[in-house]
Amino acid sequence: IPVEDASTTINFPEDGTYYVYARTYNWTSPWSKAKGPGRFILKIDNKRLMPVLGDEGEQWQWQSAGKVSVKAGKSILSLHDLTGFNGRCDAIYMTTDMGKLPPEPKEELEAFRRNMLDLPFEPIESSEYDLVVVGGGIAGICAATAAARLGCKVALVNDRPVLGGNNSSEIRVHLGGTIEVGPNKGLGRMIREFGHSIEGNAQSAENYEDEKKSKMIADEENITLFANCRAIKVEMKGEKIDAVVIKHIETGEEQILSAPLFSDCTGDGTIGYLAGADYRMGREARAEYGEDLAPEKADKMTMGASVQWYSVETSKKSCFPRFNYGI
């Protein structure tokens, strides 16, 4: 089933020819020189701009999407993904000055973006909390709720509009872990309060019952949910985290959340990494912890990535896009 276009209404201040640029990334470029799978195009008032974007280059970059002649007033800008959820687009920039691009260096681009969006140059200081939980997946939901029920004032930061992480309707990995085993018989019991009742990966969105997770958090008076917000940096006092800076993924607004304790539930160890904590990727050698299933020598192998899908009957034929992941 084709992915619906991502669309928004924009207001052109004057008639004219506008040169259009998209900031994109060919995300398979670190391991492949071939054209990437993240191909997309732009449309203005349903008129296609011809260049295909997102499938070349080796870093985030501004790509020309061509030019368009428009009348002053409102228009619909649409991003049409050619392969389904594979495109990468950070920003779209339009100008009547041919060849005038935003800056590329990170600091200069950040200042340019703040100026264009009329954002303050310093993050907003938010309330202090007893605990800041970063990541609104299953681990984050449980950590925030457990602390809140013990009387802690909790901030829960989630970079998506829905809770659940991999178990949300956006990713659709079911809850299949074994719980309540070993010496801690109650461990994992909280999942019963919001877990979905239908098993299976990559099923219909409603199977994952996002509303249960939302209600779970909304019902806890001690939890403040920061939805659509991503932690982008940490502030340190010595070797301890003093605060995290979060950015709203739609508005670009930033806030500072302070607390004596932080729980990294990002799934990628993001907060620990930003704080300079030691980390490793891969599998440790068998001799290090005496695990029978560990390799004899340490290696870089990590969990694989699955391309999951399901099928539905429709009234017309559809095709599966052909593309190359470069592996």
Please annotate each region the language model reported.
Residues 271-327:
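Rossmann-like dinucleotide-binding core of oxidoreductases
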Residues 125-137:
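Beta1/beta-strand and adjacent pyrophosphate-binding region of the FAD-binding site
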Residues 127-129, 251-261:
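Core beta-strand elements of the Rossmann-like FAD/NAD(P) dinucleotide-binding domain
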Residues 146, 152-153, 158-240, 280, ...:
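Conserved N-terminal/central alpha/beta ligand/cofactor-binding core
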Residues 1-123:
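Extracytoplasmic
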Residues 261, 265-270:
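Glycine-/small-residue-rich beta->alpha transition segments that form the dinucleotide
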Residues 235-256:
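Conserved beta-strand-loop-beta-strand element in the redox core of flavoprotein oxidoreductases
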Residues 140:
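N-terminal Rossmann-fold NAD(P) dinucleotide-binding loop
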